[in-house]
Amino acid sequence: SLVNVEVDLRRGIPAVDVVGLADGAVKETRERVRSAVINSGFEFPSERVLISLSPADLKKEGAGFDLPVALGILNAKEDSGFIEENVLVMGELELSGRVRAVKGIHAACSTAFDSGIQYAVVPEANFDEACSVHGRKIVGVESLEEAASALKDVTCFGKAFEIKEESSESISFSDEVDENVDGLELPKRLIRAIEIAVAGKHNLLITG
């Protein structure tokens, strides 16, 4: 499910509050984001910051909320200049402001694009994975500064690669066995994976 990130700046003692059933990793976002924003050359709000992650009944896990929260804080300040569009954003932030790769990019992009979202900001390291979901506009970023710049200029978003879908009728399988896996020195789990793939006629990619 998609998570909506909202940020509100309020009067009060400077602090960052997170609501919305966040786990420990998400709550740690507060400190990472503060350092990343400042070290990226932006001014962190002096107001009390409220971060809402909705739907409230869905447990939020992982560090992938760092980048959307940071951009939400920058957008909450006046004259951010960000595009007025719903954008999928995922990424973990280092204290320096650099963006780290996260898991689940393909699934998140698929869900977001199916729901009508047109744009996605993802870590540069996840860019190829995101582009495997075709038909929308995606930008890969290496830092918070790059992400903020991208949200000010819609032309930064490149069209994802179109993936040609092969008809199942054009796929054929050979009944010939090229090699007996019993004679190969492979880990047992890999042999098991090969057996399952062959039995179910599934694709299997082995690297290394």
Label the model's feature ranges.
Residues 1-207:
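Peripheral, non-AAA+ core regions of ATP-driven protein-machinery
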